[in-house]
Swiss-Prot record:
Family in the record: Belongs to the sterol desaturase family.
Protein name, UniProt field: Very-long-chain aldehyde decarbonylase GL1-5
Assembly and binders: Homodimer.
Phylogenetic placement of the source organism: Eukaryota, Viridiplantae, Streptophyta, Embryophyta, Tracheophyta
Annotated EC: 4.1.99.5
PANTHER family given in the database record: STEROL DESATURASE (PTHR11863)
Ranges for domain Fatty acid hydroxylase: 138-272
Record's note on what induces expression: Induced by salt stress and abscisic acid (ABA).
Reported function: Aldehyde decarbonylase involved in the conversion of aldehydes to alkanes. Core component of a very-long-chain alkane synthesis complex. Required for the biosynthesis of very-long-chain fatty acids (including polyesters) in cuticles, anther tapetum and pollen exine.
Entry-linked InterPro entries: CER1-like_C, Fatty_acid_hydroxylase, Sterol_Desaturase_Related
Catalytic activity of the protein: a long-chain fatty aldehyde + 2 NADPH + O2 + H(+) = a long-chain alkane + formate + 2 NADP(+) + H2O
Cellular location(s): Endoplasmic reticulum membrane
Ranges annotated as spanning the membrane: 99-119, 126-146, 186-206, 224-244, 332-352
Major location (coarse): endoplasmic reticulum
Length: 621
């Protein structure tokens, strides 16, 4: 929102929410009616092509978002090395409003502008006219309009909304108040209307112009330099005809320079070009030599088939909210399956997120496999190779800690990471499975005054650590699985072993639950029971009517942890899993020991370190 919002700042269809697309429905329905009644030979192809054009533009914009987020996560060629937060993502979530507005104007033009009907596929003279009118009137008028927008009155009432984003993403380019974007649309319509009135319009030329505008807008705001220097060496005048991402980035950091739309020519002739433009461009290209140094690497993986859309490089709005299954995502199953196949064939981990806390630089890398892959025996060797390759690459890049998230630390897969330590005994990076902090979170989630709990579900390394800690606190732990009870009993110190017992039934109102707990067993719990998961994955909540469920082991992160603008799987905003935080603490504290295999660090020490650095228990709803 602008500093002091003026008239027509809000979009008129804001209250429609996701139903705003119905605004285009009458024209879309009319188009299909025309096809049904007249046939493809008689119908106006230009009118019919508007809907595919809008869909293509949305895909084009999404591609830029994904590429930009992947590139900026790696830190290569990055221009502004600062983070963004959730408020920017929320502010820019309505980027498709511009597509809807453009669609409405295109439909109106195709119906009512003279010469806008029954356009041919291509006319060279029309394409040339569009290029000339854009380079002349459009660029000239935009330059002076843009300068006017930086006048105090217009800036505070309108343009400050766009400049709220210092660190830009591709789609920042179309985040403006409604009135301002209407003015831009009218400006860009000059070449199109001129072609229609002169009888030189064509479908392909119009589409190329729209794609050109989207491409240049996205490129200018992507926050990484991608224009190679050899282009300007080969054709020097290009410097005045095409801006670069670093050129426009200076406009967002300096505000009073580099006003041009896409052609810096006007900044040169009116002496508003930032003097550091060339230097920033060259320095941004130099960042290509090597990826940004990293201290902590967290290895995660894809979960469900649709989880790829919820990762940071996916759909920004989905990534900014806890993962939930949405019915309409099922309609994207062809793309989901294609993504799975492409991911499965990809032979290396990829960077999905970059964070900074104090002087510690962190990255999250995703192993290109889904959760179901980890349950396939014939996939285990390939998955281990991928994790091993990632660990070695992180170590080569100077990482101090590699934390294993989700199923990447499964005991049946790699003995909680110990397999890599045995293979590479001189490994510089510390391997951390996060058991101590995960167990500490579970123990500290138990309400004060609790004297007995029930432990149900598969007994993992975390479950064993929790059981030992609770028995030492003289809290009675009742297990519901006899076989697991006999396996765990010898691991409890003799002095407190009586605190661990087996029973098919129990009266405790606190259940510590893990994977493998079925619905029937949950229904054996009393009303008012608190279920606290110790597993990586959330349990199926079948007792929401009378019981409550905690999140999987996690903590809220402090404000000093920056560039957090996506949710970690199903966790709330600015909440991270204990396994991920454990790696961060390892680096912050400078601990030199591994936590893998059967090794568990001192839970009290790890918990105290987490609290000291500002991590907080998650408030349960």
């Amino acid at each position: 929102m602008a500093t002091n919002p003026g008239l027509f700042t809000e979009w008129p269809w804001k209250k429609l929410g996701s139903f705003k697309y119905v605004l285009l429905a009458p024209w879309v329905a009319h188009g299909w009616y025309e096809v049904a009644t007249k046939g493809w030979r008689e119908v106006d192809l230009g009118y019919i092509a508007i809907l595919p054009s809008l869909l293509l533009r949305m895909l084009h914009n999404q591609a830029w978002i994904t590429i930009s987020r992947l590139q900026n996560a790696r830190g290569r060629r990055q221009i502004v090395r600062r983070g963004i937060e959730f408020d920017q993502v929320d502010r820019e979530r309505n980027w498709d409003d511009q597509i809807i507005l453009s669609g409405i104007l295109l439909y109106l033009g195709a119906l009512y502008v003279p010469g806008g009907q029954h356009l041919p596929l291509w006319r060279t003279d029309g394409a040339g006219l569009i290029a000339l009118l854009h380079a002349g009137p459009v660029e000239f008028l935009y330059y002076w309009f843009h300068r006017a927008l930086h006048h105090h009155f217009l800036y505070t009432h309108y343009h400050s909304h766009h400049h709220s984003s210092i660190v830009t993403e591709p789609i920042t380019s179309v985040i403006h108040p409604f009135a301002e974007l209407v003015a831009y649309e009218l400006l860009f319509s000059i070449p199109l209307i001129a072609c229609a009135l002169t009888g030189t319009a064509s479908i392909i030329a119009f589409e190329m112009y729209l794609i050109y505008i989207d491409f240049m807008n996205n490129m200018g705001h992507c926050n990484f330099e991608l224009v190679p220097s050899w282009l300007f060496t080969w054709f020097p005048p290009l410097k005045y005809l095409m801006y670069t991402p670093s050129f426009h980035s200076l406009h967002h950091t300096q505000f009073r320079t580099n006003y041009s739309l896409f052609m810096p020519f006007y900044d040169y002739i009116y002496n508003t070009m930032d003097k550091s433009s060339d230097t920033l461009y060259e320095n941004s290209l130099k960042n290509n030599e090597e990826e940004e140094a990293v201290d902590v690497v967290h290895l995660t993986h894809l979960t469900t088939l649709h989880s790829i859309y919820h990762m940071r490089p996916g759909f920004a709005e989905f990534a900014s909210r806890p993962y939930v299954s949405r019915w309409y995502m099922r309609m994207m199953w062809p793309l989901s399956w294609l993504s799975m196949v492409l991911t499965w064939t990809y032979g290396s981990s990829f960077t999905v997120e970059r964070n900074v806390m104090k002087k510690i630089r962190m990255q999250s890398w995703a192993i290109p496999r889904y959760s179901f892959h980890y349950g396939l025996d014939w996939e285990k060797e390939a998955i281990n190779d991928l994790i091993e390759k990632a660990v070695c690459e992180a170590d080569k890049n100077g990482a101090k800690v590699v934390s294993l998230g989700l199923l990447n630390q499964a005991h049946t897969l790699n003995k909680s990471g110990e397999q890599y330590l045995l293979k590479y005994p001189k490994l510089g990076a510390r391997i951390v499975d996060g058991t101590s902090l995960a167990a500490a979170v579970v123990v500290n989630s138990i309400p004060q005054g609790t004297d007995q709990v029930i432990l149900a579900g598969n007994v993992s390394k975390v479950a064993r650590a929790v059981a030992q800690a609770l028995c030492k606190k003289n809290i009675k732990v009742t297990m519901t699985n006899k076989q697991d009870y006999h396996l765990l009993k010898p691991e409890i110190p003799e002095t407190v072993a009586d605190n661990l017992s087996f029973s098919k039934t129990g009266t405790a109102k606190v259940w510590l639950i893990g994977d493998g707990l079925d619905s029937a067993e949950q229904f054996r719990a009393q009303k008012g029971t608190l279920f606290i998961p110790y597993s990586q994955f959330p349990p199926k909540m079948v007792r929401k009517d009378s019981c409550s469920y905690s999140t999987t082991p996690a903590m809220a992160v402090p404000k000093t942890l920056q560039n957090v603008h996506s949710c970690e799987n199903w966790l709330p905003r600015r909440v991270m899993s204990a396994w991920r935080i454990a790696g961060i603490l390892h680096a912050l504290e400078g601990w030199n020991e591994h936590e893998c295999g059967d090794k568990v660090l001192d839970m009290d020490k790890v918990w105290s370190a987490a609290i000291m650095h500002g991590f907080c228990p998650v408030a349960q709803g």
